């Protein structure tokens, strides 16, 4: 245990000393490709709601997302992409975001509430596109390294909100945490919907990926979130996202 604590302290010092704190800008355009059986018209109808949520809700809190535009259609080489599929190639998840030859992309399944999954992955790819950003957080007297993922801590259908589609239909939008959520002494707001009552709080189905004894693990608020959180941690470990890969940190 003592050795693990020493290693963690060394890791934190390395991150704080070596890393830049600048936020990467998101792509000017994120292309939405439909590889599912869902009609293109359904996606096109919902797209203005996602764009409005991005511009009016998310970007004012996470400035790196400013100016990003959602475009329905095939992605040219090198473009960021969100792929909508019938079933994702991942265990215990309805969506995920990753890199394809260094290019950020996300996959969204139509199996569950695709609108919530879409906005969840959108929020995360905008802030942590290369899966290399972390937050140095200090719950109580501890110091931890959290993956900078903006929708996982407040995951859950109870916490979604609604924006109108082009035709006026309600589109469900995932809640997201603000930068203040990662700062233990902040006054808030800590998430867009106002569901969290303190920094670092995990809501009922929420989880958080964190660095534990040199490997990525998951903190979770309930048994229901345990499986999904640990599945995501396994994906991070599979890609060996360790200190060698981390390039940007948010101080807590």
Q: How would you label these PLM feature ranges?
A:
Residues 2-12:
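Bacterial N-terminal signal peptides that target proteins for export
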Residues 12-20:
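Bacterial N-terminal signal peptides
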Residues 26-43:
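Fold-level signature of zinc-dependent metallopeptidase catalytic domains
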Residues 111-123:
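Short alpha-helix carrying the canonical HExxH Zn2+-binding catalytic motif
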Residues 121-123, 128-131:
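Acidic, glycine-rich loop-and-strand cores that form catalytic or ligand-binding grooves
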